[in-house]
From Swiss-Prot:
Signal peptide range: none
Name of the protein described by the UniProt record: Dihydrolipoyllysine-residue succinyltransferase component of 2-oxoglutarate dehydrogenase complex
Region named Disordered: 74-204
Upper taxonomic lineage: Bacteria, Bacillati, Bacillota, Bacilli, Bacillales
Quaternary structure annotation from Swiss-Prot or TrEMBL: Forms a 24-polypeptide structural core with octahedral symmetry. Part of the 2-oxoglutarate dehydrogenase (OGDH) complex composed of E1 (2-oxoglutarate dehydrogenase), E2 (dihydrolipoamide succinyltransferase) and E3 (dihydrolipoamide dehydrogenase); the complex contains multiple copies of the three enzymatic components (E1, E2 and E3).
Low complexity biased stretches: 163-174
PANTHER family linked: DIHYDROLIPOYLLYSINE-RESIDUE SUCCINYLTRANSFERASE COMPONENT OF 2-OXOGLUTARATE DEHYDROGENASE COMPLEX, MITOCHONDRIAL, DIHYDROLIPOYLLYSINE-RESIDUE SUCCINYLTRANSFERASE COMPONENT OF 2-OXOGLUTARATE DEHYDROGENASE COMPLEX, MITOCHONDRIAL-RELATED
Pathway note: Amino-acid degradation; L-lysine degradation via saccharopine pathway; glutaryl-CoA from L-lysine: step 6/6
Native source species: Staphylococcus haemolyticus (strain JCSC1435)
Length: 423
């Protein structure tokens, strides 16, 4: 019987968590059709069936951790149910759903049984429920043993939702009986909230700690007078939009261009250590940190040295949209050479960014703040200033090169016409 395995995703990804089954047991499956969503350390990916037929078994449950190459489902011959997803299945036909759920529960796998036991009643009697019902109950803290199922006594998602609404209504009428907040063991009289970290959050925490422990990280600072680049941007803004189909000229393209020039001048900043070797990259794939609901993601703009300002702005904007819409692919997230992060969008005046992955350095941008600057010994003017930071691995980059790199960034941003001429 054809098997569905966790596919090879990227060199650094060895496992993932099943976020959601998109197909129920008994559903028809087309070749190349997604049957589940897998959460990895970097992005969520859909796992597809390589065969046409009927989903016979789910060999892991939502929330289970599965490894690359592990068999997670089987597909057999037949036409199956007409519905193509869990939500469509629940919406189209009450009787079809009940038959579908009965099929699934008639052949439970070991991992499914374990999952169901966690949602059983005090007498350890298994609750018959569809995957979407189990998931909704788990995410919202609903005890399935308290939910009554319609038709065939199978609990469906709408049964859980109705039970949840009824419980909330009852709770609002009995405010005097509110449950006390969960207490921590260290401070028994203080309220806390305890929740499980997402896979991506756990991975980020692990990797950040690894970087701190395994690199000789230092940070050097400089300041940039943003007067000229702001005036140039203001002067070119409208014409740039007309010439490039609505693409706006932002600061990030200037800093990306400056970073490419500085990386060419100081190639060790574009390097990494591999065992006893140092690998100096001859390409310029620069990561741009994007804040999302799932935390900070760093997709990479490829071949920045070959892109003009408009192409850079479009690429950066497209990656930001994909990141916030959770549509980034693994190809967007791996094999970068350098990273830029902008804490200034959140109001940060100065920070020490942490190096990303196996890279040698990261550039930090910050808020633009108008403050008095001594132009010469007799003149003080208010200028829009930005602090910039370069965190770097001292095992690869000497202090002289780090300072020189950041000074090059400063000089190019303060003379932005040079960047335009280069591109």
């Amino acid at each position: 019987m054809p098997e569905v395995k966790v596919p090879e995703l990227a060199e650094s990804i060895t496992e993932g968590t099943i976020a959601e089954w998109l197909k129920n047991v008994g559903d028809s499956v087309e070749k190349g059709e997604a049957i589940l969503e897998l959460e990895t350390d970097k992005v969520n990916v859909e796992v597809v069936s390589e065969e046409e037929g009927v989903l016979q078994e789910q060999l892991a449950s939502e929330g289970d951790t599965v490894e690359v190459g592990q068999v997670i489902a089987t597909v057999g011959e037949g036409s199956g149910n007409a519905s193509s997803s869990k939500e469509e299945s629940s919406d189209q036909s009450q009787s079809a759903n009940n038959d579908e759920a009965t099929k699934e529960l008639a052949q439970p796998t070991e991992s499914q049984s374990n999952n169901e036991e966690t949602q059983s009643n005090p007498n350890n009697q298994r609750v018959n429920a569809t995957p979407s019902a189990r998931r909704h109950a788990r995410e919202n803290g609903v005890d399935l043993s308290t939910v009554s199922g319609k038709g065939n006594d199978v609990v469906r998602k709408d049964d859980v939702e109705n039970s949840q609404k009824a419980a909330q209504s009852q709770s609002s009428q009995e405010t005097s009986k509110k449950e006390e907040p969960k207490k921590s063991s260290g401070a028994p009289n203080k309220p806390v909230i305890r929740e499980k970290m997402s896979r991506r959050k756990k991975t980020a925490a692990k990797k950040l700690l690894e970087v701190s422990n395994n690199t000789a990280m230092l940070t050097t600072f400089n300041e940039v007078d943003m007067t000229n680049v702001m005036e140039l941007r203001k002067r070119k803004k409208e014409q740039f939009i007309k010439d490039h189909d609505g693409t706006k000229l932002g600061f990030m393209s200037f800093f990306t261009k400056a970073a490419v020039a500085a990386l060419k001048k100081y190639p060790e900043v574009n390097a990494e250590i591999d065992g006893d070797d140092m690998i100096t990259k001859q390409y310029y794939d620069i990561g741009v940190a994007v804040s999302t609901d799932d935390g900070l993601l760093v997709p990479f703009v490829r071949d920045c040295d070959k892109k003009n300002f408009a192409e850079l702005e479009r690429a950066i904007a497209d990656l930001a949209v994909k990141a916030r819409d959770k549509k980034l692919g693994l190809d967007d997230m791996v094999n970068g050479s350098f990273t830029i992060t902008n804490g200034g969008v959140f109001g940060s005046m100065m920070s020490t960014p942490i190096i990303n992955g196996n890279q040698a350095a990261i550039l930090g941008m910050h808020s633009i703040i108008t403050r008095p600057i001594a132009i010469d010994k007799d003149t003080i003017e208010n200028r829009p200033m930005m602090y910039i930071a370069l965190s770097y691995d001292h095992r690869i980059i000497d202090g002289k090169e780090a300072v020189g790199f950041l000074k090059t960034i400063k000089e190019l941003i303060e003379s932005p016409e040079d960047l335009l001429l280069e591109s």
